[in-house]
Curated annotation (Swiss-Prot):
The protein's name in its UniProt record: Ribosome-binding factor A
Keyword NADP: no
Assembly mode: Monomer. Binds 30S ribosomal subunits, but not 50S ribosomal subunits or 70S ribosomes.
Family, similarity comment: Belongs to the RbfA family.
Location within or outside the cell: Cytoplasm
This protein's UniProt keywords: Cytoplasm, Ribosome biogenesis
Biological process, per Gene Ontology: maturation of SSU-rRNA
Gene expressing this chain: rbfA
Function: One of several proteins that assist in the late maturation steps of the functional core of the 30S ribosomal subunit. Associates with free 30S ribosomal subunits (but not with 30S subunits that are part of 70S ribosomes or polysomes). Required for efficient processing of 16S rRNA. May interact with the 5'-terminal helix region of 16S rRNA.
Disulfide cross-links: none
GO CC terms: cytosol
Length: 123
């Protein structure tokens, strides 16, 4: 139980540190000036690697390009974030896209279809 609380605490601290670095220190053109949200961080049991799940607001560049830029900058992000956290070993960061906008878009399109059908049947 104590380990579970510890993991949650470390995950939260990692999430904050990584978000701060992305916001303030990363100067990559496909990362800066983008709406990037770190939705969650999942640290491995051995504390050697972390899965960082991000949500990227759609922009003129594709989300995949921004994700690729994050993956390319993972070492820099880890180095900068390690300055804020006191950990014996700082984990390797692996970024994954967590698309939270697609379900919303899907629901909105379904509601629009229902509204159109309703107009046709009840003029």
């Amino acid at each position: 139980m104590a380990e579970n609380r510890r993991m949650k605490k470390v995950n939260a601290m990692l999430r904050e540190a990584i978000a701060k670095v992305i916001l303030k220190d990363v100067k990559h053109p496909k990362i800066s000036n983008r709406w990037i949200t770190i939705t969650r961080v999942s640290l491995s049991r051995d504390l050697q690697s972390a899965c960082v799940y991000v949500s990227i607001m759609p922009h003129e560049n594709s989300q995949e390009e921004t994700l690729a830029a994050l993956k390319a900058s993972a070492g820099f992000i880890a180095f900068q974030a390690s300055k804020d956290l006191v950990l014996k070993y700082f984990p390797d960061l692996n970024f994954y896209l967590e698309d939270i906008f697609s379900p919303q878009d899907h629901i909105e399109s379904l509601l629009l279809k229902i509204a159109e059908q309703d107009k046709k049947t009840n003029p």
